[in-house]
Amino acid sequence: LFMIGFTGTTVTKDLASFLTASKPGGVIFFRRNLESVQQIVDLTNGLQKLSPAQPLLIAIDQEGGRVSRLPAEFTIFPPCGQLGQCNSSELAYSAAATIAKELRAVGINMNMAPVLDVNSNPDNPVIGDRAFGAAPELVGEMGSATIGGLQDNMVIACGKHFPGHGDTATDSHRELPVVD
């Protein structure tokens, strides 16, 4: 099962040809793919039409805070670190449920969230407020509630970047972190 990213905001002939030939299991959207509610609906519908036998996984990084790919028409959520400071699994569930409902409304069925790293290294350039906090118990409770809020509303959750990325001092987008 492959999941691919692509450039552009529409299903072009080249993209359609590639998807038809390669038959990926899914696509992931980034900011470069998303302009408006209607454009996202048109894009997801167009992509799904290319995969009539097996619905595509259509994924996004919609964590809240600085990792939010949807345009401004959607609800803006705080980073997970702020939710963690509230220490309310009910709030985490509710936020995730709302995110899921908005994603489903435009045809997105998978969220590359939540971040399940424990923010144990203040020098980490990537995790920071993307984590629910520095206590494993808090991260577990809030992460579990977030997964429930997404999945109870028909959006697949994908926990990340474990194991231990929160304890590194390396940007994993630039080099491979090592956890001792």
Predicted regions and their residues:
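Boundary/entry segment of secreted carbohydrate-active catalytic domains
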Residues: 1-11, 146
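Short beta-strand/loop segments at the ligand-binding rim of alpha/beta enzyme cores
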Residues: 2, 57, 154
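Enzymes and membrane/adaptor proteins characterized by extended Gly/Ser/Thr/Asp/Glu-rich
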Residues: 21-139, 161, 166-180
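Metal-dependent enolase-superfamily TIM-barrel catalytic cores that perform enediolate-based chemistry
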Residues: 141-145, 149-153, 159
